[in-house]
């Protein structure tokens, strides 16, 4: 059996410059907020995701797609550049309490064998981390996910995202990110996708210290995501995180959020988003070169 490794989703430099287009109801809300006619149709999301794959995948080492809106279309249309690996989201988002993703389970409809035949090299699992929910349940889910990936020769990517506790109102996001890393940073996955400390804001030294604390608890390669980070601050966030030990990024919003809902979608992706992704890839290569 052909077993993929993280080297199959990196750039030649060994760094990760990966694009996410697997946002689901959150993306629909972004289109609605941008003034798209309501209700925003599934086809609007699918078209945007497929166009993003076609236009931006040449500049990414991998692209993360979701089964619900675009995996099948991306495969059928050969939307992903040959130089770019495909990652498929293996998480099912369960809405509740007024938010699009209130809990997450492994998507039982996932077919790792088919994904591999379609050219997929990795699966991704979102793990919501709340201090007052059962740690063992999270660890068990990650273990099952890792086994699902590795038994089919696919790379396992976990994405712990912290949330306020179900009960009470005390929430220290920064401490929660560290606590999640302590719990899941040595859980047997191949890659850890993490929220940027401090939302990428503030003095560089503070960001670096926070990122180094995170690095101390993650016993696998790790990358940052861009949700919650101002897109103008994201290139610096990538530099700082990589200085602390990260190996790149897996991000969507910092690359394409600014063109959601604009006319001439393909043109916007090419003229506005592609240069951003290219620049981020250059930063990853530059930071990896410093490690040699």
UniProtKB/Swiss-Prot annotation:
Top-level class of the enzyme under EC nomenclature: lyase
Gene Ontology MF annotations: 6-deoxy-6-sulfofructose-1-phosphate aldolase activity
Pfam families listed in its UniProt record: DeoC (PF01791)
Keywords from the UniProt entry: Carbohydrate metabolism, Lyase, Schiff base
SUPFAM superfamilies on file: Aldolase
Organism superkingdom: Bacteria
Residues of the active site: 193 (schiff-base intermediate with substrate)
InterPro entries assigned: Aldolase_TIM (IPR013785), DeoC/FbaB/LacD_aldolase (IPR002915), LacD_aldolase (IPR050552), SFP_aldolase_YihT (IPR017291)
Catalytic activity: 6-deoxy-6-sulfo-D-fructose 1-phosphate = (2S)-3-sulfolactaldehyde + dihydroxyacetone phosphate
Family: Belongs to the aldolase LacD family.
Subunit details: Homotetramer.
Function text: Cleaves 6-deoxy-6-sulfo-D-fructose 1-phosphate (SFP) to form dihydroxyacetone phosphate (DHAP) and 3-sulfolactaldehyde (SLA).
Record-given protein name: Sulfofructosephosphate aldolase
Taxonomic source organism: Escherichia coli O157:H7
Gene: yihT
């Amino acid at each position: 059996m052909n077993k993929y490794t993280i080297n199959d989703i990196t750039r030649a430099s060994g760094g990760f410059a990966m694009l996410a287009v697997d946002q689901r109801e959150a993306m629909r809300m972004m289109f609605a907020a941008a003034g798209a006619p309501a209700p925003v149709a599934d086809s609007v999301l699918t078209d945007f995701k497929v166009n993003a794959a076609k236009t931006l995948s040449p500049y990414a080492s991998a692209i993360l797609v979701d089964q619900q809106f675009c995996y099948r279309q991306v495969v059928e249309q050969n939307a992903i550049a040959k130089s770019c690996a495909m990652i498929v989201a293996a998480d099912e988002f369960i809405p509740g309490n007024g938010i699009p993703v209130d809990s997450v389970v492994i998507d039982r409809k996932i077919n790792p064998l088919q994904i591999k035949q379609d050219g997929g090299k990795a699966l991704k699992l979102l793990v919501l981390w709340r201090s007052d929910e059962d740690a063992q349940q999270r660890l068990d889910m990650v273990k099952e996910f890792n086994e699902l990936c590795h038994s089919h020769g696919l790379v396992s990517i976990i994405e712990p995202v912290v949330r306020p506790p179900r009960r009470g109102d005390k929430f220290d996001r920064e401490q929660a990110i560290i606590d999640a890393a302590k719990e899941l940073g040595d859980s047997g996955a191949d890659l850890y996708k993490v929220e940027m400390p401090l939302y990428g804001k503030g003095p560089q030294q503070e960001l670096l210290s926070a990122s180094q604390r995170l690095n101390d608890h993650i016993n696998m390669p790790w990358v940052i995501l861009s949700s919650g980070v101002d897109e103008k601050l994201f290139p610096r966030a990538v530099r700082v995180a990589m200085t602390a030990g990260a190996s790149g990024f897996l991000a969507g919003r910092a690359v394409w959020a600014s063109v959601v809902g604009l006319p001439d979608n393909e043109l916007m992706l090419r003229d506005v988003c592609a240069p951003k992704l290219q620049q981020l890839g250059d930063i990853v290569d530059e930071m990896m070169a410093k490690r040699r």
